[in-house]
Amino acid sequence: MKKAIAVDWLDKYGGAERVISSITKIFQIETCYTLINIMNEEDLKKVFPNNNIKIKNSFLQLFKSKFRYLFFLFPYFIKKIKVDKSVELIISSSFSVAKGIKKTNPNQIHISYIQARNQRYLWDKEGIYFGKKVRVLLSPILNLLKKIDTKQASNPDYLIANSRFVQNWIKETYKMSSEIIYPPVDVENFKLQKNKENYFVTVCRLEPYKRVDLIVKAFNKSKENLIIIGSGSQENYLKKIAANNIRFVEYSNSSVVYNYVSKAKAFIHAGIEDFGIAPVEAQACGTPVIAIKKGGLKETVIENKTGVFFKEQDSNAILEAINRFNKIDFNYEFIRNESLKYSTSNFESKLNDFVKSKIANDKR
């Protein structure tokens, strides 16, 4: 059986790319269709260890790193990609428009793994991506893109959600059903660390939607120590407002992150995630999580056993959660064991079984 994968774009290596790598490995993918490939060679080898894979790009390749400015044309260009008619199985990994790739043969099976709320900038209700005035000006275009996105969501034969949170979003937004298969987390490469030190840690991109500003404001009111690992557009602002008990560490490599996360009292996360890989990695070290009780983290954190929740994105709510956390005696080994259900091997086994069952059904 000839197989291909469709992805939105290839630029940086992260959680979404780990999923792509696993899919490629499981199904021995031969061809990757994408809007654009601007990923460096080192990262590309992580995604596709098999150097024989063919990467086919769209016209957007001409725009290189400026391609995001043409976001309103993404649905058009994904539709224009022509999958080889000899391909029998298409698996799309979609956080934007990859699900919209069209079959070129009625006998093809298209299964889409929905990595996140697709094209979040279209469906954003919190005003994170566009200010109110800009959103009003763009509303005719955004409304049209919503209709196209909903239509393209019906292109796959089957949808898989990466969390219950995303599954509910798919149902609410596209009026479609989906199965849940949690994404692969490299928990096997994290070791249990029982000797915790006197600091909290957060690791993420320093962007507005991650709400690191709320974590900083909470620790400004606290005597607890905080280490922030990451970079982004808010870095200078966060450093400016941070008190002396808050330290910033630039992300250099995974061993640096592991060293800080494994020894931390707790990992703190204030953003609403579709799944949230970093908090699961923290738990793989035996490090409890303090997180917003919304999004995918509701599924990966067990209240008072593997972490503590706060209900609203508010600095006082975070501070109150820290105070509750300090009164709980956590079992680090239990936390580590709970993280193992999100292993890469579990993901690969469940996805393989799902695809096999759909192929078998299709042949009946």
Q: Locations of the language-model features?
A:
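Membrane-proximal helix-turn-helix segments that form the acceptor-binding/catalytic region
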Residues: 84, 130-159, 167
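Conserved donor-binding/catalytic core segment of Leloir-type glycosyltransferases
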Residues: 185, 191-210, 216-227
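Conserved acidic donor-binding segment of nucleotide-sugar-dependent glycosyltransferases
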Residues: 303-304, 308-315, 322-329
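Nucleotide-activated donor-binding/catalytic signature segment of Leloir-type glycosyltransferases, i.e.
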Residues: 236-255
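A charged, aromatic-enriched C-terminal amphipathic alpha-helix characteristic of glycosyltransferases
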Residues: 74, 313-316, 327-358, 363
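Active-site donor-binding segments of glycosyltransferases and PAPS-dependent sulfotransferases
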Residues: 32-99
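Acidic donor-binding loop of glycosyltransferase active sites
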Residues: 262-274, 287
